[in-house]
Structures are given as C-alpha cells and as structure tokens.
C-alpha cells in the first residue's frame, strides 16, 4: 500500500467514474446503478453531495461520497466503493476515517457510515 489520499472528483474524472460504475464488482455495492457521462456530470454538480476520488500511491482506486442533511447542524454520511484490486488492504477504513476527521474539523457535527448488512468486510472495517 502506498500513500493513501483523497481528492475532489472533477469533470475530468467522469470517464473513470462511469467506467467504475459499469463494473459488476462495483455495481453490487451501488444498487446496480450505471450512469452515462451526462448523468455523471449531473451527479458531480449536486449541491448536497461531494464526490472524492480515493488514491493509493497516486493511483485512483475508489470513490467516497460525503452527503449532507438539508437542515443544520452540519451532518451527514459517507458511502463509497473500492475497485476489486484495492479491496482487503485497509484502504477504505483508513481514507474514510481521514475524510470524516476532516469533515468534523470543517464543522460537521456527525458523520455516519452505513454499509450493507451483507458487506461483512465493510462492517469489520
């Protein structure tokens, strides 16, 4: 495992995100939803959700979304996925903790993560 980081997803990431969401190994963690380029551009523009590209040693390996509740206080949750080759190495818990810590430092009062009940690996993380 290299240096773990996250960065804001940009319009340049749309082809990557569309491709990831078309992967059956990702689809199972995303309610089977696939997206066109236009739909992904719309998703990036949502005011209540920020999308983050997860990187391992500078290579993109997954996505986290931070979503906000509409009413104060500032609170919300995280959800996301890793590509198959990045799973099982502690990447998601490490980056999710870092992002949650940064959100709290930015004034969030609560950050939740609610993996699927069948996703035992995520629950253990």
Question: Which ranges hold each PLM region?
Answer:
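Acetyl-CoA-dependent GNAT
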Residues: 11-12, 28-87, 102, 106
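Conserved catalytic core of Hanks-type protein kinase domains
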Residues: 20
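Conserved N-terminal entry element of GNAT/NAT acetyltransferase domains
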Residues: 1-15
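Conserved GNAT acetyl-CoA-binding A-motif
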Residues: 105-116
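Short loop-to-helix capping motifs
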Residues: 23-24, 119
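Conserved active-site alpha-helix within GNAT-family acetyltransferase domains
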Residues: 89, 93-94, 117-125
């Amino acid at each position: 495992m290299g240096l773990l980081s996250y960065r804001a997803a940009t319009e340049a990431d749309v082809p990557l995100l569309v491709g990831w969401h078309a992967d059956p190994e990702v689809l199972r963690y995303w309610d089977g939803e696939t997206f066109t380029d236009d739909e992904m551009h719309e998703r990036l523009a949502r005011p209540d959700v920020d999308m983050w590209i997860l990187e391992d040693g500078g290579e993109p390996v997954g996505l986290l979304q931070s979503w906000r509740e509409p009413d104060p206080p500032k609170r919300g949750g995280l959800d996301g996925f890793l590509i198959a080759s990045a799973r099982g190495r502690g990447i998601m818990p490490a980056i999710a903790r870092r992002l949650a810590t940064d959100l709290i430092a930015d004034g969030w009062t609560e950050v939740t993560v609610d993996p699927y009940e069948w996703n035992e690996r995520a629950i253990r993380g």
